Curated annotation (Swiss-Prot):
<dbReference type="Pfam" id="PF01290">
    <property type="entry name" value="Thymosin"/>
</dbReference>
<dbReference type="GO" id="GO:0030334">
    <property type="term" value="P:regulation of cell migration"/>
</dbReference>
<keyword id="KW-0206">Cytoskeleton</keyword>
<keyword id="KW-0007">Acetylation</keyword>
<dbReference type="GO" id="GO:0007015">
    <property type="term" value="P:actin filament organization"/>
</dbReference>
<comment type="similarity">
    <text>Belongs to the thymosin beta family.</text>
</comment>
<feature type="region of interest" description="Disordered">
    <location>
        <begin position="1"/>
        <end position="44"/>
    </location>
</feature>
<protein>
    <recommendedName>
        <fullName>Thymosin beta</fullName>
    </recommendedName>
</protein>
<feature type="modified residue" description="N-acetylserine">
    <location>
        <position position="2"/>
    </location>
</feature>
<dbReference type="GO" id="GO:0005737">
    <property type="term" value="C:cytoplasm"/>
</dbReference>
<keyword id="KW-0963">Cytoplasm</keyword>
<keyword id="KW-0009">Actin-binding</keyword>
<dbReference type="InterPro" id="IPR038386">
    <property type="entry name" value="Beta-thymosin_sf"/>
</dbReference>
<dbReference type="GO" id="GO:0003785">
    <property type="term" value="F:actin monomer binding"/>
</dbReference>
<dbReference type="GO" id="GO:0005856">
    <property type="term" value="C:cytoskeleton"/>
</dbReference>
<dbReference type="InterPro" id="IPR001152">
    <property type="entry name" value="Beta-thymosin"/>
</dbReference>
<comment type="function">
    <text>Plays an important role in the organization of the cytoskeleton. Binds to and sequesters actin monomers (G actin) and therefore inhibits actin polymerization. May be involved in the regulation of structural plasticity in the CNS.</text>
</comment>
Length: 44
């Protein structure tokens, strides 16, 4: 059971991790996202 849930979970987490990591990094560096940041994230 653990193995079955671990496989799909990792795949989904990895996909979300990329988006979350980018947003978290930008948020930590810039408390207020600028228009350029939003545009870059939208294009991402």
């Amino acid at each position: 059971m653990s193995d079955k849930h671990d496989k799909p979970d990792i795949s989904e987490v990895t996909k979300f991790d990329k988006s979350k990591l980018k947003k978290t990094e930008t948020h930590e560096k810039n408390p207020l996202p600028t228009k350029e940041t939003i545009d870059q994230e939208k294009q991402g």
